[in-house]
């Protein structure tokens, strides 16, 4: 039970009216201590990534696929991901974004059901239908993964450029 092993639920933060919703994997200890998503070194990298495409972090809404820290910060199991995915989809429907950015394999599995290698799916625009609304989404590496494997940052940069182009294509003000 993830809830029993966590200090608190990390729901989401940022602009609830944002046209962009970013979904990460799950909170870490820094997130839990501060009660916010994407804190510490991970948050610093995310902020830099967004600024690289002229988006201020406070102009997006971010949350996690699973809102509780896992024991020893391990990757959530497929069963845990599935348990929280309906809650996450409802969360997306409430925020009602125009674009979803899925960061990491947990987010990819929670929303798309795919559990193959993220490198096979990243950088491709896909669509998901939630409550009769079609949303474009893109999958990319999570900031925590990029910190562990910095050589993948070049691929994330390509993904970020695609996000910037989609924002322009859809004439989204951010």
Feature roles, as predicted:
Residues 1-174:
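A polyanion-binding, active-site-adjacent surface
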């Amino acid at each position: 039970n993830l809830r029993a092993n966590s200090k608190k639920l990390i729901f989401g933060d940022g602009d609830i009216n944002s046209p962009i919703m970013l979904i990460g994997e799950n909170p870490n200890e820094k997130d839990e201590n501060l009660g916010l998503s994407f804190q510490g070194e991970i948050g610093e990298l995310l902020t830099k990534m967004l600024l690289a495409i002229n988006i201020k972090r406070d102009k997006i809404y971010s949350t996690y696929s699973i809102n509780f820290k896992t024991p020893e910060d391990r990757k959530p199991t497929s069963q845990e991901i599935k348990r929280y995915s309906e809650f996450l989809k409802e969360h997306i429907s409430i925020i009602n974004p125009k674009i979803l950015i899925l960061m990491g394999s947990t987010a990819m599995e929670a929303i798309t059901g795919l559990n193959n290698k993220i490198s096979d799916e990243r950088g491709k625009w896909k669509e998901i239908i939630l409550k009769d609304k079609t949303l474009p989404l893109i999958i990319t590496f999570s900031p925590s993964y990029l910190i562990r494997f910095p050589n993948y940052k070049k691929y994330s940069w390509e993904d970020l450029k695609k996000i910037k182009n989609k924002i322009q294509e859809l004439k989204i003000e951010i």
